[in-house]
């Protein structure tokens, strides 16, 4: 159950470094909306404290003695579902995405040593802890590892039934029959991993994604999406050519737009503009694909705020389709909810149905 607005958010800090535990706790020391109710040095101690203290959110280091963060996440998801924010160094990018697949809500990237003057990290940590007030009341971690072993993924998170995506030969050039532009933020990485696992190698669509994520993580995330399914997926670079069964993730701290030159559809990747409220900007991406009219689909997944709203209006006005993730599965209903309230959603679907819908193109 998410915390009410009348009491502080109860936070449990889990890290094997006493120095890091102190620095993380200090971020919230004088904040009226957050109470640090406990600290743990490893996963075993953390599980005991979760049961005893019933925190609203946990910050988690992944590399710890006795019980590491991955084991903690598996047991937590099966016993006491609780929002978890991973605090990890830039050098541990692969581990971060493994944690997200195991059900972690989000992550904060930090330098290898967290110092009290790391202002940007402290602000990001505070923002993401406060975000738990916006979670759906029935929050359950969106783990990709099926507990019964009969789903689409093996116990280690490896997809079953898919071979690694082949490198596509793009000559002679064939444009995609449809461009699917996807907007996502908090909860988005695990949602995208599930979606991309559904897309068949025979799809005639190209997929372009604006996921709010730090710049050092988007390439690793694109590589995981590429391994997850049959669509060849990369971090976008300026000039990339859209083709059937290709996927492109906008690099962090940049914005991505589609440009059409004759029959060619290419990507333009560059710095953000002062008018961009969110970076990467789903609004800019959506507006750029809108001229395709009925040949484009805008998808708005889980996330805080309203990025994608203006772009969704442009797509609808041009004759395209907008799909919003329903509140049943959206971890945070801000972005899709804004599109629904504005009357812009052609379809409002839970995540599995979005995958089914898009896999037909």
Name each region found by the language model.
Residues 1-12, 17-29, 33, 44-45, ...:
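Conserved acid/base catalytic micro-environments in cytosolic active-site loops
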Residues 41:
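Glycine-rich phosphate/oxyanion-binding loops and their immediately adjacent helices
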């Amino acid at each position: 159950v998410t915390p009410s607005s009348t009491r502080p958010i109860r936070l449990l800090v889990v890290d094997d470094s006493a120095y890091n535990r102190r620095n993380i706790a200090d971020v919230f020391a004088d904040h009226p909306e957050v109470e640090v109710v406990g600290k743990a040095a490893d996963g075993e101690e953390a599980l005991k404290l979760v049961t005893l203290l019933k925190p609203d959110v946990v910050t988690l280091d992944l590399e710890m003695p006795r019980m590491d963060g991955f084991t903690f996440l598996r047991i937590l998801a099966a016993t006491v579902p609780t929002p978890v924010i991973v605090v990890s160094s830039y050098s541990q990018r692969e581990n971060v995405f493994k944690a997200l697949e195991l059900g972690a809500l989000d992550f904060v990237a930090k330098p290898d040593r967290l110092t009290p003057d790391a202002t940007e990290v402290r602000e990001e940590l505070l923002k993401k802890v406060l975000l738990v007030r916006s979670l759906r009341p029935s929050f359950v971690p969106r783990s990709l590892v099926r507990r019964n072993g009969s789903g689409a993924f093996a116990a280690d998170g490896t997809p079953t039934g898919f071979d690694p995506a082949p490198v596509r030969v793009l000559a002679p050039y064939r444009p995609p029959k449809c461009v699917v532009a996807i907007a996502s933020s908090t909860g988005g990485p695990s949602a995208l991993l599930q979606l991309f696992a559904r897309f068949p190698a025979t799809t005639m669509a190209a997929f372009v994604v604006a996921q709010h994520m730090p710049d050092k993580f988007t390439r690793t995330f694109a590589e995981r999406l590429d391994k997850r399914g049959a669509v060849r997926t990369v971090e976008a670079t300026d000039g990339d050519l859209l083709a059937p069964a290709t996927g492109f993730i906008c690099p962090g701290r940049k914005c991505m737009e589609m440009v059409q030159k004759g029959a060619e559809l290419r990507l333009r990747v560059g710095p953000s503009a002062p008018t961009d409220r969110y970076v990467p900007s789903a609004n800019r991406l959506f507006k750029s694909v809108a001229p395709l009219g009925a040949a484009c689909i805008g998808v708005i997944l889980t996330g805080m705020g309203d990025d994608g709203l203006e772009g969704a209006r442009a797509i609808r006005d041009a004759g395209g389709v907008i799909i919003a993730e329903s509140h049943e599965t959206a971890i945070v209903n801000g972005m899709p909810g804004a599109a629904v309230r504005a009357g812009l959603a052609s379809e409002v679907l839970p995540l599995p149905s979005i995958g089914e819908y898009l896999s037909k193109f």
